Amino acid sequence: PYTPSTPSTPSAPGLDKTKTDSAAAINAAATANKYDAAEQAEVKKILDKANADIKNAKTEAEVKAIEEAAQAEIDKILTTEEKAIVAALDNVEKRDFETKSKVITRKGGKKVIRLTWTAPDGVDVDGYEIFRSTKKNSGFGKKPYFTTSNTSYTNTKDLKAGKTYYYKVRAFVVINGERVYTDYSMKAFRTIK
């Protein structure tokens, strides 16, 4: 009599290819940056764990998740050059990064507040965040009032006669997609009369 055979589970060529591709992608990401010996040791730990996890993965989705997690961890490791940038930002002090302000009367009598500052020494910044408040020591909020790549800003909106406006500025550099900030500048303030 005919006995149907139990179908064998075929090996998943798609999964094998995904494993190979993911391992290659992680290794490529690790060698793309210029890491020193200590940083390379950190990267090697991540790679060894990821490669072991990929071998044991059961699905393509699992492999992709391992690859993405490993790449994210590798991206967090700062190179010597990036560490130097962070150190330079940390060394920018308020007195080195002063914000000046003045009230300007435009044609038609409208008054605006013009802010200017000097780029911090030793740092190639990507931009500046300006914070504004009507209180001297609070009310600046966590979100910047304005962001610019220039070393000046003219506040033309939401200005009322008799009010004093306080401003502080901080510079930032983008490293691995994240903003790293200097300390805030000394506050500048002006009263609209």
Regions found by a protein language model. Give the residues of each.
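Beta-strand-rich modules
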Residues: 158-176
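Ser/Thr- and Asn-enriched, surface-exposed coil loops between beta-strands
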Residues: 59, 107-111, 147-153
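Recognizes extended acidic, P/S/T-rich segments that occur
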Residues: 129-161
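Pro/Thr/Ser/Gly-rich low-complexity, intrinsically disordered linker/stalk tracts
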Residues: 84-122, 179-193
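An aromatic-rich alpha-helical recognition segment common to small helix-rich domains
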Residues: 117, 130, 155, 167-169
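Solvent-exposed strand-loop boundary residues in beta-sheet-rich modules
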Residues: 121, 134-138, 175-177
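Solvent-exposed loop segments of extracellular immunoglobulin-like
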Residues: 124-126
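Beta-rich interaction/scaffold domains
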Residues: 1-88
